[in-house]
Amino acid sequence: YSGNDASSPYEANYLEDICEEISEIEENKRPQILFRRCPVDKSNRFDKVLEKYKGLIFSIDPDWRIDKENRDSFATIYPTLNDVKLLVNTVFHSDLVLNLGSTMAHDFAVLNKPCFYLNYNPVKNSIFKVEDVYSFQHFNSLKDIDAVGFINHKNDIKKNIYDTLFSSKVIGKDRINWLNRIVLHPLEKNSKNLIEEIE
C-alpha cells in the first residue's frame, strides 16, 4: 500500500481496511503488506494500524532529505539515490500495489505489475470524497483503457487481491499503454532529458 500526503485524510482508514480484509485470507495463502508512506507525511496517523497488524504489515519509510524550513512541501524535500533503490526493490518484490490514485501505479507498470485504486469513501458524510480525487484532469488519460483495477467497496479488497494472486485474472491489462501516455519514452533517457531541460 502506498500512502498519500496529509491532504488525503483517510489514508489510515484505507490501510486498516486492507489489513482487516487480508487478515481474513487463510494463513498459508495470506500475502504480507508492505506499506510505503508518502515522503512528506511524517505524521503518526498510521501508528495504531501498524501496531495492531504487526506481523502482517511492514512499513518501509522513503529515504528523502528535507531542505529549508518548510518541512511539509515537495519543493523542499527530495529523494536520495538510496530511496530510488528502495523503491525499485519494493516494486520488484511486490505482486501489486493498492492506493488512492497514486502515481505508484506507473512505478509498478514499469515492471508490468498491476495496481488497484481504492474507489470508495471510508467515512460517510465527509467533505473529502473519493469522487473528487478521480475527477482531477490527469485521470482523463485513463479513458478508453483498462489500466488499473478499481476497488469500489471495502468488501471487494480481499477477493480482488486473492484473484490477482491466485487466478489467471488480469488486472489493468492496458497498464503499459497508460504508462506510455503519461511518461516520455524511452524511460532510460528521462534523466538525461531532464538535465538538458534544467540546463
Predicted regions and their residues:
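Short His-Asn-centered micro-motif
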Residues: 1-2, 36-37, 98-101, 118
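Conserved catalytic-core segment of nucleotide-activated headgroup transferases in glycan assembly
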Residues: 1-76, 151
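Amphipathic coiled-coil/heptad-repeat helices and related helical stalk/stem segments
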Residues: 11-18, 83, 90, 101, ...
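Short active-site oxyanion
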Residues: 32-33, 93-96, 145-148
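Charged, glycine/proline-rich intrinsically disordered loops and linkers
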Residues: 58-83, 129-138, 142
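Acidic donor-binding loop of glycosyltransferase active sites
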Residues: 75-83, 88-102
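Catalytic binding pocket for nucleotide-activated donors in carbohydrate/polymer assembly enzymes
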Residues: 103-183
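C-terminal alpha-helical cap of glycosyltransferases
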Residues: 187-199
